[in-house]
Amino acid sequence: MSTRPDLRNVAIVAHVDHGKTTLVDAMLWQSGAFSERDTVEKTGERVMDSGDLEREKGITILAKNTAVHYTGPAAQDLGLQDGVTINVIDTPGHADFGGEVERGLSMVDGVVLMVDASEGPLPQTRFVLRKALQAHLPVIVVVNKVDRPDSRIDEVVSETTDLLLSLGEDLMNEGIDIDVDSLMDVPVVYASAKAGKCSLDNPGDGQLPTEDLEPLFETILNRIPGPSFDEDMPLQAHVTNLDASPFLGRLALLRIHNGTLKKGADVGLARHDGTIQRVHISELLATEGLERVSTDSAAPGDIVAVAGIEDIMIGESLVDLEDPRPLPLITVDDPAISMTIGINTSPMAGRVKGAKVTPRQVKDRLDRELIGNVSLKVLPTERPDAWEVQGRGELALAILVEQMRREGFELTVGKPQVVTKEIDGVLSEPMERMTIDIPEEYLGAITQLMAARKGRMETMANHGSGWIRLEFVVPARGLIGFRTRFLTETRGTGIASSISEGYAPWQGTIEQRLTGSLVADRAGQATPYAMTNLQERGSFIVEPSSEVYEGQVVGENPRGEDMDVNICREKKQTNTRSATADVYESLTPSRKLTLEESLEFAANDECVEVTPEAVRVRKVVLDAQERFKIAARERRANR
């Protein structure tokens, strides 16, 4: 086997919000990828998060790659005068985007694991690290944010070592061969990505490291091997991601394992069904910094994009036509959460100019999403204008709906459900392992909240700083609508994150929402006068003088049953007074629900109407008489 000394492929993995994308920024700046003239807008902060939604929410959704060209002292020591190209893959930290993580890891030879110096390793860290160890990738630990005033560096390093060893033990029990000595000897780099500084020595809690990112580059070069390949093997390249370019059409991102790829060549495409198809490579692009530049040929270990293959799919391989040897397909965790997405069926449908409202447009958009999103499944339902979309978690699905909303779609979205399975004849549901950090005084409230959702406490640790860390195993459907209740109970201070734990037998019924809904009983405009008289009955989620229709949920009833209300009632006026003057002072402001909150808020007989201009919660059956008949039938059936 030969290796390439002038190339390193690295994935940066961490829990959400521990600073992966910020570190990539600092690496690009210090290796000179941006010229002095570049504006902040062009480079900005978190260059890798290029989507609007990613910038707003501050999370990475798609795994992306960039190339850092490094020519510093560490490269000179290894005798590489021209420097080293480090291909960096920035992976998402959310387990909901697990499909992205697995694809990212199939492209690299080593992993940089980032851990927050105060929070320590969290569930998503465990998730990604397990995947990396399964693939036998060397690990470098970066303790980030060491300059936080509440950092506890030594504890976090020992927690991370414990995590590595316990994962190694788990995998050995499953029959996977792990080198435990190498896990004991994992290098640790102390860093502050935002300041762009790091060192190999512990700077002390809350202190800034002294050097720039040189020690990190040095550790990457020394610890992570160059890509290895077999000189006698024919071409083998794995498609790990898809992209589109307005000029070149569909692009496939490849990692070349063996052989060379040339622009204009004819190669074989090994399909999912085992057939080999002859394809022509019309354009070959390599990454430099954040730009893609055209190149004539690519060697083993390179991560490149090819154009000219229209229907190429993720997980397929490019092979030699004379001697085809396809690579194994990429496997992704099964989806755990599903929801129905269909066209907007409410009386307000089609009011927005230029909105996309036909079933055909929705179906085409969902099919387009399937191309690049490996962890998604779309299944037909009994209605021709709605589809069941399955994904890893409700965040991934809510982000798909939000993207469609911004593209001008009008949709009806059902409440998220779990995807159940029959295992050995027993109905089973997906479970999640949840880690919760809360101040001590909320311990009782949170234990009660989790018990109501069939959560089982596994461990409880007191950090001694007034904070407690709890670990629960809980059914995935217990976490639908959990976040809002959790933040209310802990007054916004709690931190909760979860990760898939496989399947377990069905846990029984879970009470989702203890309150009922206030439902509009006629169409019209919500009047401040009616809302003032109704506000002691509950809280509202619509604004005064907004339009409502029959069957729309306009508020929350503190009692457990639904109540039909007339929110359009007008005040009988004497001829001189203004209609609204004396009402607005006494009206409590309405709650504004975002898309995710609406999905959590909706009861089982409700769905969410999503248009480019508004998000509304409504009953599935709009007519009050019909709803009454259905409820009576259910009561009779339960007797």
Feature-to-residue mapping (PLM):
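Structural and coupling elements of P-loop NTPases
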Residues: 1-639
